């Protein structure tokens, strides 16, 4: 029913995949991505766990409109999140290669 290796082989493969995924998640958490807005005037750096590590604001913006600065910060944050998710997807692709995952399924769980 389970082919060569039987159920034991299937369980071993599942355990190995789980270990590889955990290792990759740990590696991803250590990586950093930077999102930008306003042609680099606002930069936000997140780690792979989406925790904010750093916010950089060009001094010229301190004299500008408060609402514009808030919009630029939000845009930079959203850009950083998008980049972090892309990076995670690329890194996890090697672990999930050959698995049929449903559309929109995000890794790690």
UniProtKB/Swiss-Prot annotation:
InterPro entries assigned to the protein according to its UniProt record, in alphabetical order: YbaB-like_sf (IPR036894), YbaB/EbfC (IPR004401)
Coiled coil: none
Domain of life: Bacteria
Keywords recorded for this protein, A-Z: Cytoplasm, DNA-binding
GO cellular component: bacterial nucleoid; cytosol
SUPFAM superfamilies per the UniProt record, alphabetical: YbaB-like
Subunit and interaction comment: Homodimer.
Entries under HAMAP family matching the protein: DNA_YbaB_EbfC
Annotated protein name in UniProt: Nucleoid-associated protein Asuc_0997
């Amino acid at each position: 029913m389970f082919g060569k290796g039987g159920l034991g082989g299937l369980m071993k493969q599942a355990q190995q995949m789980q270990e590889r995924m955990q290792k990759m998640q740990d590696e991803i958490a250590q990586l950093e991505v930077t999102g930008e807005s306003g042609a680099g005037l606002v930069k936000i750096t997140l780690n792979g766990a989406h925790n904010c590590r750093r916010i950089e604001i060009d001094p010229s913006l301190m004299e500008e409109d408060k609402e514009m600065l808030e919009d630029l910060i939000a845009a930079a944050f959203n850009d950083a999140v998008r980049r972090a998710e892309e990076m995670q997807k690329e890194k996890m692709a090697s672990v999930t290669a050959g698995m049929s995952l449903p559309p929109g399924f995000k890794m790690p769980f």
